[in-house]
Amino acid sequence: MIKQYLQVTKPGIIFGNLISVIGGFLLASKGSIDYSLFLATLVGVSLVVASGCVYNNFIDRDIDKKMERTKNRVLVKGLISPKLSLVYATVLGIAGFALLYFGANPLAMWLAVMGFVVYVGVYSLYMKRNSVYGTLIGSLSGAAPPVIGYCAVSGQFDAGALILLAIFSLWQMPHSYAIAIFRFKDYQAANIPVLPVVKGISVAKNHITVYIIAFMVATLMLTLVGYAGYKYLVVASAVSVWWLGMALSGYKTQNDRVWARKLFVFSIVAITALSVMMSIDFMTPASKDLLTYIG
């Protein structure tokens, strides 16, 4: 039973988000780490993400059973009752928000609330099923964790937080479109209006290329504005150029599914590399904050 309760929280997604939280947190810490704050932020975000994933599993159980990738999920197979899953999700969310509020700061909690509302209320409940722009809206919630990690330390939403939001939002787009291409039949069977299904794979390839170029620019801004050093810049540039090269190779590929899977895998390598580099090659910018939270 414990295994099912763990599975429904999507541990892989939680782990991936924690990497970005750590990146944002350590970027803002600039070598001076408050370990109790660090722990509270990691656990708090983990609980909120877990809550969102359980709610998502509850909402998506009707379409999950139509997809090969998701047909064996806990709620689809009835291993946990829908009502119990809602209670579980609610408890996880309340615990996570409370921990961020009292263990970090109110700004971190409110950022988590906004990310949660976008993911569960806007994306999962409506946009995913009804709009080709669902991925774009969902990317905002996917970018929340590193911003929460950053603001847990800084206590303010400044240019650094805005750049992180841009980097991780833009990264989500080619990452998600790649999944939609190599899982094309799944999304088609479930009638989910993702771009590759609605507009075609060739159009999706164009969007992937444009978003990766925008991602390249956003990653460079951390150094150009003064938040990260030149070691980060070198890695960010190399990763972005390689990812763009992979995207461009898609125009000549004979097998879109294989190409998209490779692009997806490298997207994870890319964002992990950036998270690690911003954690260790940080700087203090001369510019001041855009928006300061006053508690």
UniProtKB/Swiss-Prot annotation:
GO cellular component: plasma membrane
Pathway: Porphyrin-containing compound metabolism; heme O biosynthesis; heme O from protoheme: step 1/1
GO molecular function terms listed in the Swiss-Prot or TrEMBL record: protoheme IX farnesyltransferase activity
E.C. no: 2.5.1.141
EC supergroup of this enzyme: transferase
InterPro entries: Protohaem_IX_farnesylTrfase, UbiA_prenyltransferase, UbiA_prenylTrfase_CS, UbiA_sf
Membrane topology classification: Multi-pass membrane protein
Cross-referenced CDD domains: PT_UbiA_Cox10
GO BP: any one term: heme O biosynthetic process
Record Pfam families: UbiA
Catalytic function, reaction form: heme b + (2E,6E)-farnesyl diphosphate + H2O = Fe(II)-heme o + diphosphate
Subcellular location: Cell inner membrane
Bilayer-crossing regions: 8-28, 35-55, 84-104, 107-127, 132-152, 162-182, 208-228, 229-249, 263-283
Record keyword Methyltransferase present: no
The keyword Cell inner membrane is assigned to this record: yes
Keyword terms: Cell inner membrane, Cell membrane, Heme biosynthesis, Membrane, Transferase, Transmembrane, Transmembrane helix
Additional record remark: Carbon 2 of the heme B porphyrin ring is defined according to the Fischer nomenclature.
Protein function: Converts heme B (protoheme IX) to heme O by substitution of the vinyl group on carbon 2 of heme B porphyrin ring with a hydroxyethyl farnesyl side group.
Family stated for the protein in its record: Belongs to the UbiA prenyltransferase family. Protoheme IX farnesyltransferase subfamily.
PANTHER family: PROTOHEME IX FARNESYLTRANSFERASE, MITOCHONDRIAL (PTHR43448:SF2)
UniProt-recorded name of the protein: Protoheme IX farnesyltransferase
Species, as recorded: Erwinia tasmaniensis (strain DSM 17950 / CFBP 7177 / CIP 109463 / NCPPB 4357 / Et1/99)
Encoding gene, per UniProt annotation: cyoE
